[in-house]
Amino acid sequence: MIKIRLKRYGKKNRPTYRIVLIESQKPRDSKTIEELGHYDPLLKQANFKFDEIMKRVGQGARLTSRVRYILKQFS
């Protein structure tokens, strides 16, 4: 199953996340299929390709609860 979820990067105690399309059984920081945006929780900023995310959801990708929350908050 393909999921749209967060991939952590950044520094210790200073996380930033990429919103990525990835196989659900792979580890969080493994190779992704596609990068769809990014999210900075400390600055409360998010940039993402909303049209591309909706296209992938239409093709059967599932959103994690955290990504769904980010999309609702910043759309």
From Swiss-Prot:
Q: Which InterPro entries does the UniProt record give?
A: Ribosomal_bS16 (IPR000307), Ribosomal_bS16_CS (IPR020592), Ribosomal_bS16_dom_sf (IPR023803)
User: Gene3D superfamilies, alphabetically?
Assistant: 3.30.1320.10
Q: What Pfam families does the record tag this protein with?
A: Ribosomal_S16
Which compartments is it annotated to reside in? Plastid, Chloroplast
Keyword annotations from UniProtKB, A to Z: Chloroplast, Plastid, Ribonucleoprotein, Ribosomal protein
GO CC list? chloroplast; mitochondrion; small ribosomal subunit
- GO biological process annotations for this chain's record? mitochondrial translation
Molecular function terms, GO-annotated: structural constituent of ribosome
UniProt xrefs under HAMAP family = Ribosomal_bS16 (MF_00385)
NCBIfam families tied to this protein: S16 (TIGR00002)
Q: Which family does it belong to?
A: Belongs to the bacterial ribosomal protein bS16 family.
Write the protein's name: Small ribosomal subunit protein bS16c
